[in-house]
Amino acid sequence: MEDFIFIKGTLSDGFKLEYEVSLFNLNEHRLLQSNGEWISYHIIKEKKKVALAGIHFHLSNGIASSPYRSPFGSIDASPDLEPSALFRFLQFIESDLLKSGVKSIIIKNPPTLFSPELQTLLQVFLSNLNYQIITAEPGAIFIVDKSGEDLSANWEKRKIKQAHDIDLELRHEEMNKLKAVYDFIHNCRFQKGYPSSITFDDLQRTVSAFPGRFLLSGVYQQGAMVAASICVRCNQQVLYHFYSDHNTS
C-alpha cells in the first residue's frame, strides 16, 4: 500500500530530504528572485518524516512560474521516486493551482543531462498532460570524467598545444575580482551587440548569499585578460557555465 502523500506548503520541522535541492530552488535563492508570493508542493512519507520530491512556484497576476527569475526550476526528486507517483504529483499540482485561480502554469526544466531519468519522465508526463513547449534553448554539456592532463583525443591535444603556442594562461580568480571579471565579460558582449543576462547588482547579491558556489576564471595572454567566465555550482554534480565571453582580438 502506498504510504506517500502530496502536500501543499512548506515542510514541517524534522523532515529529511531524500533528494538534493538545486541552487535555484533553495529558499534563499528564491527570495533573491522575488520576495513576493511563493507556493510549494512536496511528496512526503509522513510516518518516516522524509520528502521524496518538491517544486516551488512564484505567483503573480494569475501566472504560476517555476522558477521566476532563474535559468531553471521545476521538480527536484529522489531517484527512487516511482514514475506513477511523479505523474500523479503533477496532476495534483495542476489541480490545486487551477482551483487557486491560476490561469497559466510555466515550468522551466533544466537540461536533460542534469538528471536524465527525471527530466525524461517530466518531458513525457508534461506532454501527456497537454503542456506545450513555448521555448526550447540549445546548450552544451561536457561530461567531466578525466583530468585536464589526461587527454586522449587528438583534437584535445591539438587545442592544448595551440593554447600553449600563443602563450594562453588559464587562471582561477579570487572573488575579490568579481567586478573586474564581470566588467570584462559585459564589455565584450556589448561590443558584439549581445545583451547581458544578469546585472552586476543581481550577480553580487547572489554571490554574497552563496559565496562557495561560484567559480571565476580568466584566460590571459602576455598578462592581459582575453577571455573570462563565471560559473556556479547548481548541485553536487553540475557546474553551470552561465556568463562568459572573449575579446574580438
Predicted regions and their residues:
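A conserved beta-strand-loop-helix scaffold within acyl/acetyltransferase catalytic domains
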Residues: E2-I63, N109-T248
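A short, internal acetyl-CoA/4′-phosphopantetheine-binding micro-motif in the GNAT/acyltransferase core
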Residues: P71-E82, Y243-S249
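Glycine-rich, often proline-containing surface loops adjacent to acidic residues and nearby aromatics
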Residues: P71-F72, V102-I105, A136-P138
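Short, conserved charged micro-motifs
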Residues: E82-R88
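Conserved GNAT acetyl-CoA-binding A-motif
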Residues: S100-T112
